[in-house]
A protein has these predicted regions:
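Short, flexible hinge/linker loops that cap or flank conserved catalytic cores
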Residues: 155, 280-281, 419-421, 451
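Short, flexible beta-strand-to-coil junctions
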Residues: 429-433, 450, 461-462
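Core Rossmann-like FAD-binding/catalytic domain of the broad FAD-dependent monooxygenase superfamily
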Residues: 1-366, 370-373, 377, 493
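Short, internal strand/loop/helix patches
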Residues: 162, 438-455
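Short, conserved active-site loop motifs that form the nucleotide-linked donor/cofactor pocket
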Residues: 114-115, 120, 286, 425, ...
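C-terminal helical "tail/cap" subdomain of flavin- and related membrane-associated enzymes
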Residues: 320-425, 430-440, 455-456, 467-474, ...
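A glycine-rich beta-strand to alpha-helix segment
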Residues: 156-157, 462-463, 471
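Short, glycine-anchored, charge-dense loop/turn motifs used at functional sites
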Residues: 293, 457-467
Length: 493
């Protein structure tokens, strides 16, 4: 019996597996596909995901094989300079094709001894919810747990299961979770292929077409290939069916008057502008993350990042439930915190689709919005939203930092994010007078100072969000159990 089964071996599932393994959780990843994807749908990490990778010591791996990019206000096809005073020590993204992201995250998961099984299709799921609370012993009583059936008849059991299996999630469907939203109204073809046309001619034609159609692009990718994006002719009845090269040629000619001599495709796909969100991210011992929990148009490049950040929020909480120290309701905070974030992405991508329209009203709106984004405050708001560095969870009233993720700061002895590689809670204490005795197995107490930090002490959750700010020991003790459970019974508090 596994502690956790993760269904889906994309970026979300692999990130979650790594987070669980940091805490010693016995996890297996079940991926339907027999081999890793070649499709570069997700094209980069935004600033918050860059922070996530830095917090786990992975950023250097991404920077070694990818380039930074710095575009602020990437909204509805409108690009502006990076805004001043955005609250991050990483004011950039990393241009990472999805196959590279998956490879690096898979390497990380395997290094941490997560088991990744490919060619494993889940076709059935059942759960027993006896003793399904978040606290000590959850999953250990009365045979409580989750059973999955694979297409080959194999059955596997675990204490918890997380569906990270994409927008057409089998796990979500087997759970019967409603997935309300808007169906696709437009469709776009996307693929990588070779071309025979001269690069300068391609660039000139693309520039002309994009004056009126922003859902169009033919640009160099890798290995001599070109990434082709072109509006489809209507919305297909079955988006799971791959388009053909002839479909691409037809639509390229329709929009550009030429097909650029496209040939020898590496992969071809289609996507629509449908937007939906699961009503619940948790049903008993089963949870949903990534595209299994929310789908939306890819405008702004937020999808892969949203899934990675779902996993970052969930991993430590699920590990706490498995380890038996999770306070009551901790797993429910996953839905409470991440559902509003997903809803905001669904909303802003719908707005971006409107801005990408070709009718006169959309063009006028885009011109107006572009002028508004020249204002620093507007650009900072939009960039903070797209990059997710402005996400604040509702922890109630308190200090202005409460619920925000803490940006990296320089300390006298190190950097803040360097202290977070093990995925534990962190008390950064500039007073030297505080104590987390009783929680030392869950929280690192660091006495250090930073010229960038004007608060006496700050308590960070394993995902880097601020759980407490202050200097009073009794006040700290009143907040520790909320996120880190009861103190170890042998410790003096």
């Amino acid at each position: 019996m596994f502690d956790v089964i993760v269904v889906g071996g994309g970026p979300t599932g692999l990130m979650l597996a790594s987070e669980l393994r940091l805490h010693g959780v016995d996890v297996v990843v079940l991926e339907k596909s027999a081999k890793p994807t070649e499709q570069s749908r997700g094209q980069g990490l935004h600033a918050r995901s860059v922070e996530v990778m830095d917090q786990r010591g992975l950023l250097d791996r991404f920077l070694a094989v990818n380039e930074k990019f710095q575009v602020g206000g990437l909204f509805g096809g409108i690009m502006k300079a990076w805004p001043d005073r955005l609250d991050t020590a990483h004011p950039y993204g990393v241009a990472t094709p999805q196959p590279v992201t998956e490879r690096l995250l898979n390497e990380r998961a395997v290094e941490l001894r997560a088991e990744v099984r490919r060619g494993c299709e889940v076709v059935g799921l059942s759960q027993t919810e006896d003793g399904a609370g978040d606290g000590a012993g959850a999953g250990a009583k009365d045979g409580a747990g989750v059973t999955v059936e694979l297409a080959d008849g194999t059955r596997l059991r675990s204490r918890y299961l997380v569906g990270c299996d994409g927008g057409r999630s089998t796990v979500r469907k087997l759970l019967g979770v409603d997935f309300p939203g808007q169906p696709a109204t437009v469709e776009t073809l996307l693929g990588e292929m070779e071309v025979t046309e001269d690069p300068a001619t391609i660039a000139s034609v693309v520039d002309e077409v994009r004056k009126t159609q922003l859902r169009f692009g033919v640009a160099p990718s890798e290995n001599g290939l070109y990434r082709v994006v072109v509006p489809a002719d209507g919305v297909s009845e079955d988006r799971a069916t791959e388009p053909t090269l002839d479909d691409f040629k037809q639509q390229l000619r329709a929009h550009a008057g030429t097909d650029f001599g496209v040939h020898s495709p590496r992969w071809l796909s289609r996507f629509g502008d449908a937007s939906r969100q699961a009503e619940r991210y948790r049903v008993g011992r089963v949870l949903l993350a990534g595209d299994a929990a929310h789908i939306h148009p890819p405008t702004g490049g937020q999808g892969l990042n949203l899934g990675v950040q779902d996993a970052f929020n969930l991993g430590w909480k699920l590990a706490a439930a498995v380890d038996g120290w999770a306070p009551d309701g901790l797993l429910d905070t996953y839905h409470a915190e991440r559902h509003p974030v997903g809803a905001r992405v669904v909303e802003n991508t719908r707005a971006q689709i409107t801005l990408l329209g070709t009718d006169p009203g959309a063009t006028a709106l885009r011109e107006l919005f572009s002028k508004l984004m020249d204002f620093e405050e507007v650009n900072r708001y939009v960039t903070g939203m797209i990059t997710a560095v402005d996400v604040r969870y509702d922890f109630g009233e308190g200090h202005e930092l409460l619920g925000l993720r803490m940006r990296d700061v320089e300390l006298k002895q190190s950097r803040l994010y360097e202290l977070m590689h093990e995925g534990r809670g962190l008390l950064l204490d500039q007073t030297g007078r505080l104590s987390v005795a009783g929680w030392a197995d869950r929280i690192d107490h660091v006495v250090d100072v930073s010229e960038e930090l004007d608060v006496p002490a700050v308590l960070l959750r394993p995902d880097g969000h601020v759980a407490w700010v202050g200097e009073d020991q009794q006040d700290l003790l009143s907040q520790l159990p909320k996120w880190f459970g009861s103190p170890h019974h042998e410790a003096a508090v």
